[in-house]
Amino acid sequence: MNRTRRLRLVLCALLCVLLCSCQTVLPANEKAQVEELLRAPKLSGDYGALQTALNDWLGESAQLKYPIQGELLSPFVLQDLDGDGQQDAAVLYTTAQTANVCIAILQRDDAGSWQVRQSVEGLAETVENVSLAQLQDTDSCQLVVGYTAAQNDHYLAVYSYQDGTLSTILEQQYEQYLVENITGGSSQDLILMSTQEDGSVQIELLTADREGSFRHVAVNGLSADKFSGCASVAA
């Protein structure tokens, strides 16, 4: 089997996973009630220390934003993001002055206390899901965040934290995404699925270089009238 056909078969299998995945989203009123309940309590341990450090840096109490689905359901992501061997922290939050979700990056100082290094504004007011990925051929780890806007539009952002700076290396509208090693390299790839205006389904396979620039490895488009399942992708 040649490389092109193998790649198309892999994309076919991934499309089946994406299309058949079941998502459970809380109604807006229930989600608001949950977040309001989670706003007030003081947390303990590292989470409490992170919350205090963020509030001190902001000069007000942040409202923590919980992803509504996925494997990572906490507003706190503890991970060595820049590959320096030290644990970093990303915190999802909003304030009275911000419409969209913000992401704060914190690191420990020499005394072991958490300190905010940077904060960036996200793409929408709701965090749909969060995942960690190794999309670059480095020791660093990227933060992949899916957002949902009020109009139910979905936006994906990939963040890279290097040399003390959090950079957005990808922003794109999407419906489903998957992180997987498809090309067989030393890093993972990003698969995006979206529906076009004419109803056709587009699948994009992207891979990143060491500098964080993404390039398209493959793009498959399936017309609405011809799409009949995975066989139409592999044909």
Predicted regions and their residues:
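Beta-propeller-forming repeat regions
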Residues: 22-235
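N-terminal hydrophobic targeting signals that begin at the initiator methionine
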Residues: 1-2
